[in-house]
Curated annotation (Swiss-Prot):
Belongs to the SfsA family. Pfam families: SfsA, SfsA_N. This is Sugar fermentation stimulation protein homolog. It comes from Ectopseudomonas mendocina (strain ymp) (Pseudomonas mendocina). InterPro entries: SfsA, SfsA_C, SfsA_N. The lineage of its organism: Bacteria, Pseudomonadati, Pseudomonadota, Gammaproteobacteria, Pseudomonadales. It comes from the Bacteria. GO terms for molecular function: DNA binding.
Length: 235
């Protein structure tokens, strides 16, 4: 995924009302930009940290700027725009970069499934049958650790997706939970049991039911983001 033009750099003044952030651009101009992240963004930002944002030419947009990348207190880069995760995964799937999911004949997005009115991020069709894939964006890192964690806040939606995947898996359908780790310098992912113990328990139950859990790490820069390597998933 290339940013054209490359992202612009600024400095964070504050994030507020979940979807808004005030920054100072490289030229010293104050600017309010959109923050496409509903999570806590724990350990992703600090007052005065460097941020990178994109601009939209759409005249109908109230806020032309979108916050894309943040420099974390640990000195890492984190893509805080959660909407990028699915696009990154789709790009990698179509390029055959996720070996465990290669060889599909069709890819469909936002496919209804399950009994709790869920939508799978992707359904991949193979001669042997469909595979349902849920994608989660991971940005929570810690001091002196190269292990990231998910989620960064209690996620009822994430727990529901685990239940839905597990139910399908018990019926003999292949299901995959894919962590898209949009945080530099990471080698493994774990459940953030201290933040959401119910999610961690649900993840263990889903794996026991046959849900495959994968993690792929991204390489980030103001010029672009791409998934480049498989990471370990810790139990």
């Amino acid at each position: 995924m290339r940013f054209d033009p490359p992202l612009e750099e600024g400095r964070l003044l504050r994030r507020y009302k979940r979807f808004l952030a005030d920054i100072e651009t490289a030229s010293g101009e104050p600017m309010t930009i959109h923050c496409a992240n509903t999570g806590s963004m724990l350990n992703c930002m600090s007052e005065g940290c460097r941020v990178w944002f994109s601009r939209s030419n759409d005249p109908k947009r109230k806020l032309p700027g979108s916050w894309e990348i943040s420099e974390t207190p640990q000195g890492r880069l984190a893509c805080i725009n959660t909407a990028r995760a699915n696009a990154l995964v789709e790009e990698a799937l179509r390029a055959g970069l996720i070996a465990e999911l290669a060889g599909f004949t069709a890819l469909k997005r936002e496919v209804p499934y399950g009994v709790e009115n869920s939508r799978a991020d992707f359904r991949l069709d193979y001669p042997s049958g469909p595979v349902f894939v849920e994608v989660k964006s991971v940005t929570l890192g810690f001091d002196d650790s190269d292990v990231a964690a998910f989620p960064d806040a209690v996620t009822l939606r994430g727990a529901r997706h685990l239940r839905e995947l597990a139910a399908l898996s018990r019926l003999g359908v292949r299901t995959v939970l894919l962590y898209c780790v949009n945080l530099s310098g990471i080698v493994a992912v774990r459940a953030a049991e201290d933040i959401d113990p119910a999610y961690a328990a649900g993840l263990r139950e889903a794996r026991a039911a046959g849900v495959e859990v994968l993690a792929y790490g991204a390489e980030l820069s103001p010029e672009g983001i791409s998934l480049v390597r498989r990471l370990d998933v810790l139990t």
